[in-house]
Amino acid sequence: MKIKFLTKKFFRARLSEFISVQTDNFLRKLKPRPFFTEYIEQVFRKNVEPNVSQNCLTLSVLTDTHEKAVASSSYYGLNGVRHIIEANKACDSLPVDYNIHLGDLIDGSDKPEISRGLLQFTMENYQNSQRPFYVLEGNHDENDKYDEHKFITSASFRRDDYYNLVTKHDFEQPEIKRLSLGSKVAWIDKGDIRVIFLNTSDIPYILNGGAKKYDFKKVRGIREQQIEDLISILEKTIDKHVVVFGHANLISQSGRSALDFNGDLVQKIFTSFNNKDSGQLKNELSGDFGVNVRYNFTDTGISTISNYICGHMHYEKCYKVNGINHIILNCSALMGKKHGLTTDYNKKWDRRYNEISELAGYFININPDKMLLQIFGYGAATRFVSFEI
């Protein structure tokens, strides 16, 4: 109680601040805990490194850190910030190709100047690390949870706040490719491997009387322009092993869209690519989420999309739909078993502060020689699972 009281008192900000100076000053005092960085390094050295070769692509992956300006010892809070600091610190001395975050950096429930401060500090940590990085947008990252809880009638984040604090820095790196300045699809290459990043929070920022038409926290989707860009990238993907990452799951086990808009269409693109088809793809919608596009995947050689990897659900699960593995990773954010919103998966882990179950993270090794995608978990995560590519 004392810790929480001091934290709430500390994070009091002036309304005029774009980023809370007090938040920024406090966050800069956070340091990686040696026990955790050593633990992450040991997991890599023992389990991952024996599988690393010159042709592999090796990723350090976190998702759903839900950073929040409270020093909670049992739920979302500053622990999410620490997990990123510690994972990136460990990877500075490891043969990792990229540091990846699958979205929901923040919980989105703090005052906007505090949430912006959390985003800025976290991205500076990624920028100062020794590895290139990519951070995807999650459905909490536009701070709509704060708007909902405070019943305010105006959007707490402006149109370009998230882009300027996060996405812009993704694309400042030469390793991260995109088709055009406005494209929401990114990709990285290494040898015969191509990794594509999709934005499952591709929601138009439209204000009605100062309030958002769409609540980014509740609405997930992919719009026509992003689908067109994905098609363009795939049409030029020749003889590659392709793995796709996003924040939210695209489809259910039954094949129905798990997004509010167009998750099933993206799955159809994947299967059409694997089948080397050409044709037209459209839905029954008009307006913001209407889609009517053409594609031609007949000249892509032996390229195949094998796996789609995401977070969002705060548990682990994998299922195969039409030959493509859909893999859901657990949240890094601490979820103590006594909290009502804690998922059953995390309750079983009985996650505790200052124990290895506090965090959850992954190393993903894509090996074209063995034709395997191997996932090595640590903390509250499955230790090993592998899939064909």
Can you describe what each PLM-predicted range is?
Residues 16, 21-24, 28-34, 39-44, ...:
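A short C-terminal boundary segment appended to hydrolase-like catalytic domains
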